[in-house]
């Protein structure tokens, strides 16, 4: 299957890549700049829009909204994808950007049909990533810094 690339300029003014598929449809290809922007938005807001019902879910939706808009051109699909990311999410902030990148890859490849897969992936990864992230950020780092400062 051959794919042709067209450089396009979206509403925000940044250059993205549209893939022309053999069936005549176009699909947005997520760039490294999109992933970095999503991670930065999430890291900035993860604890600011925290609530006890969905924990960090609103931060996930807010961080992914610009890229989801590029992936989903139709308003109905965009709203459905965005609502899917408002569900419960709780993991260490530093590690969560990897989970968001993986979910964006699935959204990009499979579209709205994979919304249950996206939610399952987030649910299955947030626990292990929280365990590793909490150990690194809240146990290992303070122990090393305390040892150095006490020396």
What would you call each of these model-derived segments?
Residues 118-151:
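Transmembrane alpha-helical segments and their cytosolic interface motifs
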Residues 1-114:
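Soluble N-terminal domains of membrane-associated systems
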């Amino acid at each position: 299957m051959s794919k042709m690339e067209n450089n396009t300029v979206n509403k925000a003014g940044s250059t993205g890549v549209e893939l022309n598929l053999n069936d005549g449809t176009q699909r947005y290809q997520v760039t490294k700049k999109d992933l970095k922007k999503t991670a930065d938005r999430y890291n900035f807001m993860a604890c600011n829009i925290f609530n006890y019902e969905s924990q960090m879910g609103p931060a996930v939706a807010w961080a992914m909204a610009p890229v989801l808009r590029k992936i989903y051109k139709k308003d109905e699909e965009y709203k459905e994808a965005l609502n899917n990311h408002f569900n419960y999410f709780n993991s260490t902030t530093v590690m969560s950007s990897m989970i968001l990148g993986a979910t964006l890859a699935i959204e990009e490849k499979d579209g709205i049909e994979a919304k249950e897969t996206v939610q399952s992936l987030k649910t299955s990864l947030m626990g292990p990533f929280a365990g590793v992230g909490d150990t690194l950020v809240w146990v290992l780092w303070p122990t090393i810094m305390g040892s150095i400062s006490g020396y």
